[in-house]
């Protein structure tokens, strides 16, 4: 990022075409094209550059949702950011994008209770086994890794205990065993921690919390590196887990004061 985090937040998302400080809210389920040639050309562009904001149906997004994705991708310093209707939707998308029946995942014990319910109960129905590790004793993480382990899911700090983990050590273990990693970074946000830059494959933030800042919108973001992009992209298109334009606009608005609010929180 060429500008500072704070400067970027204050000067992003402006609509220079209409000379407006804020971007317009574009609501569209159906996209208009001039001809069949035009739609085929757009579809070809989307296939060649799936992060480029090319869409032929509202479920794939509009210019309003794309603006938010571009902002968050810059903030996360990631390959791409997917936005979901809720923060937990991003958790679901991350896990289901990279796991299949017969796989195992290892999860930090003090995770957000819906995440625990998903991993401990719901995944069983898909023959995906979850093992929990003690964040204060990473030996429990290492010893539970098997040939079936596909993902290590971290929460830092923990939702229930607010404990901080040795992220570099976790990443070292994962890379040595060639296991994918995901982190719920809702408390930290990329203002304090950039997990993709650190080495994580996926980073989740509940946009409902600090991003929006006004308790009037639900949303989530899932930042990814290039390695897992295709898996998440395909899962997102199949499941339809995408944030709508109105919520995208409200989160974009809230981001302008993210640094001010978090600085005050951390005093």
Language-model features: locations:
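Alpha-helix initiation/capping motif
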Residues: 16-18, 57, 61, 134, ...
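A generic structural signal for short, solvent-exposed coil/turn residues
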Residues: 2, 19, 49, 75, ...
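N-terminal glycine-rich, Lys/His-bearing helix-loop that initiates the first secondary-structure elements
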Residues: 1-52
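Conserved PLP-enzyme active-site core in the AAT-like
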Residues: 6-13, 80-267
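Residue-level marker of positions within ordered structural domains that often coincide
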Residues: 32, 77, 225
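Conserved N-terminal alpha-helix of the aminotransferase class I/II PLP-enzyme fold
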Residues: 35-89, 117-121
């Amino acid at each position: 990022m060429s500008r500072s985090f704070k400067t970027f937040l204050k000067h992003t998302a402006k609509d220079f075409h209409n000379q407006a400080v804020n971007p317009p809210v574009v609501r569209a389920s159906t996209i208009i094209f001039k001809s069949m040639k035009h739609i085929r050309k757009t579809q070809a562009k989307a296939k060649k550059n799936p992060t480029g904001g090319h869409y032929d149906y509202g479920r794939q997004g509009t210019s309003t949702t794309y603006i938010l994705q571009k902002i968050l991708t810059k903030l996360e310093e990631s390959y791409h950011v997917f936005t979901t209707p809720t923060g937990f939707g991003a958790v679901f998308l991350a896990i289901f994008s990279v796991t299949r029946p017969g796989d195992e995942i290892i999860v930090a014990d003090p995770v957000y209770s819906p995440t625990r319910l998903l991993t401990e109960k719901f995944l069983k129905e898909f023959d995906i086994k979850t093992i929990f590790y003690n964040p204060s004793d990473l030996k429990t993480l290492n010893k539970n890794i098997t040939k079936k382990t596909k993902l290590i899911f971290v929460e830092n700090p923990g939702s229930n205990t607010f404990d901080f983990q040795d992220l570099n050590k976790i990443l070292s273990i994962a890379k040595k065993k060639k296991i994918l990693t995901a982190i719920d970074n809702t408390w930290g946000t990329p203002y304090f921690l950039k997990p993709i830059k650190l080495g994580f494959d996926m980073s989740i933030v509940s946009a409902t919390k600090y991003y929006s800042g006004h308790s009037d919108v639900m949303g989530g973001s899932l930042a990814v590196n290039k390695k897992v992009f295709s898996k998440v992209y395909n899962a997102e298109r199949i499941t339809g887990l995408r944030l709508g334009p109105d919520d995208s606009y409200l989160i974009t608005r809230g981001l302008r004061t993210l640094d001010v609010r978090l600085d005050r929180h951390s005093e």
